[in-house]
Amino acid sequence: MHVSHLQLADYRSYEAAYLELEPGVSTFIGPNGQGKTNLVEAIGYVATHSSHRVAHDAPLVRRGAQRAVIRAAVVRHGQTALIELEINPGRANRARLNRSPNTRMRDVLGILHTVLFAPEDLALVKGDPGERRRFLDELLTARAPRYAGVRSDYERVLKQRNALLKSAAAQNLHHRGGRDLPTLDVWDEHLAQIGAELLAARLALVAELQPLAAKAYGELTATQDPISLRYRCSATDEELDTTNRPQLVEILRAALLRARPDELRRGVSLVGPHRDDLQLWLNDLPAKGYASQGESWSYALALRLAGFELLRADGDDPVLLLDDVFAELDAERRRRLASYVRTAEQVLVTAAVPDDVPQELSGARFRVTGGSVERER
Ligand SMILES: Nc1ncnc2c1ncn2[C@@H]1O[C@H](COP(=O)(O)OP(=O)(O)OP(=O)(O)O)[C@@H](O)[C@H]1O
């Protein structure tokens, strides 16, 4: 798939921007702070309905404006879908598909697939478990949009359950072991059921990612260093060896029972997919805390490339967004990454310095300065 047009109104530093894009490689060059990342962020937003840089939408709207609009034409298998997103911080965002006003946000999720590589990816390896959970969940949702619903159902259950636990903690109910809290039993069951669905999907995804990430890491670094992805579930100390949902429901139910006194004391949910982690191992050591800067960065790239391979195997190349990644790599790794990604249907690259972009990625070139984007001829 590829994006053939992008139009922005009041998005970040852009009052108005319009670009025509082609399949193949396009490079966006310009000095720091001119709006290169804002462009790829906007395309990523169309795919995931979130930004890789901020957790909330407010910074996406141009200072002084009320709302931002992103319009993107996405060409898939010869058909064009016109997606329009209106970002209204503090209020519901709105979507239109092919100009139809009767579109829900979730109707346009999963039309455009992107894989974004950015300096922030280092947090995949070095950051909190939430970064890795988000990586898995975004990939799940790209492959099967219904997981957006599963994730938001899970978030809702968690919020309700936490509110209940918080008020129980305030009333010191843990002294009675929570026996007279039938509503908590109901929320436990919801959490176990929906949590198991998410857990099963994540475990299956990790199993698929493992060989692809190992291959990508080997190719990027030209080493045989073994990497392994291990899903750590908060419900058990052992490594889970099943993706069977009824079994996972049982495991979560039992863990919730065990955790209840602690949860009532602390007033938060301590068990479930929101507390899990994807541990990344390199050479039989956890990458977090042991891997070098260069190894961590290659690991993060390998995870993104594995995601790319999975989406590609599902039948359509995602659009690759490479935001300022070459500056972080030595010449050899730049070349290796470039030859890996240049086979994708569309690759959009940003760089402050043209020389950072390997020759393998020559293509259309755009100059970005002060909120305007011009194609170089
Ligand atoms: N909501 C906003 N309203 C107005 N301007 C904004 C908004 N958000 C970001 N900006 C501006 O956008 C610019 C940053 O754009 P961007 O991150 O795309 O830069 P870049 O060209 O990728 O730079 P670098 O090469 O340093 O990564 C900054 O000048 C910032 O002040």
Swiss-Prot record:
Alphabetical list of InterPro entries matching this protein: DNA-binding_RecF, DNA-binding_RecF_CS, P-loop_NTPase, RecF/RecN/SMC_N, RecF_2
One Pfam family here: SMC_N
Binding site for ATP: 30-37
GO biological process annotation, one example: DNA replication
Main location: cytoplasm
Protein's cellular compartments: Cytoplasm
Family, similarity comment: Belongs to the RecF family.
Protein role: The RecF protein is involved in DNA metabolism; it is required for DNA replication and normal SOS inducibility. RecF binds preferentially to single-stranded, linear DNA. It also seems to bind ATP.
Protein name per the record: DNA replication and repair protein RecF
Organism whose genome encodes this protein: Thermobifida fusca (strain YX)
Annotated gene: recF
